[in-house]
């Protein structure tokens, strides 16, 4: 999940869903509220820890943050120097996740089809939005960016990292991680906690009351997000980042046969297949673990 959340266009929520921990994650997060905090005061840490599924949350968060801290530099380098190959791998991964989540939809009717199309349209529209030109690293802005992005991170198909890109916060956040600026990281994390506790309760309610339709819309989100991670892009406009380097600002998806330069088509297809197979393998591991 940490590695996925670093990539602008891939959602850690998708990985959580595929690995079979998504609903447990929502239940555990939404259990953190004023009532359980009172339980901590009256009954002690042991009772509180059990109610919020503490072992699960700590193990998951440690894995996410370890992955983000260790892979942020590598993924940034790969996105800059090998973008087609990186996007190809994640395209295959996300494509397989659509099939995986789609299999869990138990009822198809006109409302479900509309929900799928609406979810796909919303996600596609988000992928076509232009990022903000300015990069902002003020504490208040990073707090708000963390709160908004975390909502996307736990939604399968909507990338929290891409939301940071749209807000103009992606580069400041990566810089804070690279430079070990723990003050800015803490501000971002606090915003993320506030957003996470609020949004998880809504998602938990939707799963409890409208699970089938929620799955339909989430599948649509992932389907629509494929536009963002399509490997071959044409750059329409450029911008100069904070380091004085010219980088793509506005891009659109094109055919690999229309791509200027080496499309790396054969290797891209291979990596897409590997990404697709990785999800199938992850699904089998999750199923075997749940059957034990």
Language-model segments: which ranges?
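Multi-pass membrane proteins that catalyze or facilitate reactions on polyprenyl-/lipid-phosphate substrates
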Residues: 1-5, 11-155, 159-292
């Amino acid at each position: 999940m940490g590695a996925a959340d670093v990539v602008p266009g891939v959602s850690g929520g998708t990985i959580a869903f595929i690995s079979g921990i998504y609903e447990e994650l929502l239940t555990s997060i939404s259990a953190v509220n004023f009532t359980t905090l009172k339980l901590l005061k009256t009954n002690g840490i042991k009772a509180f820890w059990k109610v919020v599924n503490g072992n699960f949350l700590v193990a998951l968060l440690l894995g996410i943050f370890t992955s983000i801290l260790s892979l942020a530099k590598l993924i940034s380098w790969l996105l800059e120097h090998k973008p087609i190959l990186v996007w190809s791998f994640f395209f295959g991964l996300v494509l397989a996740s659509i099939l995986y989540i789609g299999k869990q939809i138990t009822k198809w009717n006109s409302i479900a089809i509309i929900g799928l199309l609406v979810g796909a349209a919303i996600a596609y529209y988000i992928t076509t939005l232009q990022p903000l030109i300015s990069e902002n690293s003020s504490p208040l802005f990073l707090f708000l960016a963390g709160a908004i992005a975390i909502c996307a991170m736990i939604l399968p198909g909507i990338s929290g990292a891409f939301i940071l890109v749209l807000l103009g916060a992606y580069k400041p956040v990566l810089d804070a991680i690279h430079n070990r600026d723990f003050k800015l990281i803490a501000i971002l994390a606090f915003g993320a906690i506030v957003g996470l506790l609020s949004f998880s309760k809504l998602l938990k309610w939707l799963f409890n009351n409208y699970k089938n339709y929620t799955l339909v819309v989430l599948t649509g989100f992932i389907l629509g997000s494929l536009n963002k991670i399509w490997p071959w892009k044409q750059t329409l406009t450029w911008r100069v980042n904070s380091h004085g380097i010219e980088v793509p600002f506005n891009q659109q998806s094109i055919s690999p046969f229309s791509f200027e330069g080496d499309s790396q088509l054969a290797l891209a297809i291979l990596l897409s297949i590997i990404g697709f197979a990785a999800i199938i393998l992850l699904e089998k591991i999750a199923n075997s673990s749940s059957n034990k």
